[in-house]
């Protein structure tokens, strides 16, 4: 039996999370009014596993960590994608239909939707295909050291005029998914520092500044 805890909170909107050592068991938006609110969670834990592949035939890079997420308007769960594309999302505590998104964890905050899944049993398996192309960019100084925590703008080609705002990680790296081939301009402080051209596969490039 779980523990019961009383909390006194100002009225407003909150995020209620229940976690163990393996991760999130429940994660829900709640609204506190001037009335008493009681929340109970039946924590029957399930899992989702499978494999993610690239539609363009590329493989996952060992140096780029990936997250995979189940999301709906009230609750979310998360897991990691390994180098061979396999993944597992443990501790799913609510049956239902979810959007499935992926994101490189050293890149932008933009998640890419790869499908939906219905969780209605304790064990679910489903594979997903990632459309688009991965840009892996490393910014270095003249000595070859990565330029960490730099705000970078990536401007899309004329066929897809979109700008992505990203911060490099502590190694000077950025990874993000773009939807169309073409030449992308890399800028820092509105100054162009190079281009990356996407043809039919994921692309990695080092840019020295």
Which sequence ranges carry the predicted segments?
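Extracellular beta-sheet/turn segments enriched in Thr/Pro/Gly and aliphatic residues
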Residues: 28-45, 115-132, 196-209
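A short beta-turn/strand-edge loop motif at beta-sheet boundaries
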Residues: 57-62, 144-148
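A short, solvent-exposed beta-strand micro-motif common in secreted/extracellular proteins
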Residues: 2-3, 7-22, 94-107, 180-191
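A short, amphipathic beta-strand motif
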Residues: 41, 48-54, 128, 135-141
């Amino acid at each position: 039996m779980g523990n019961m805890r009383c909390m006194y909170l100002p009225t407003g909107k909150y995020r209620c999370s229940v976690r163990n050592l393996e991760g999130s068991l429940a994660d829900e938006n709640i609204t506190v009014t001037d009335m008493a609110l009681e929340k109970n969670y039946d924590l029957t834990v399930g899992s989702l596993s499978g494999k993610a592949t690239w539609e363009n035939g590329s493989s996952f890079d060992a140096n780029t960590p990936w997250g995979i997420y189940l999301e709906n308007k009230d609750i979310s769960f998360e897991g990691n994608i390994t180098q061979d594309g396999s993944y597992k999302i443990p501790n799913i505590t609510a049956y239902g239909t979810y959007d499935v998104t992926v994101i490189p964890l050293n890149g932008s905050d933009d998640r890419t939707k790869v499908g939906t899944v219905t969780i209605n049993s304790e064990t679910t398996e489903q594979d997903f295909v990632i459309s688009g192309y991965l840009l892996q960019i490393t910014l270095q100084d003249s000595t070859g050291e990565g330029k960490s925590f730099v705000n970078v703008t990536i401007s899309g080609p004329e066929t897809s005029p979109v700008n992505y705002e990203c911060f490099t990680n502590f190694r000077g790296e950025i990874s993000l998914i773009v939807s169309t081939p073409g030449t992308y301009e890399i800028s820092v402080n509105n100054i162009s520092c190079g281009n990356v051209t996407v043809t039919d596969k994921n692309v990695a490039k080092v840019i020295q500044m």
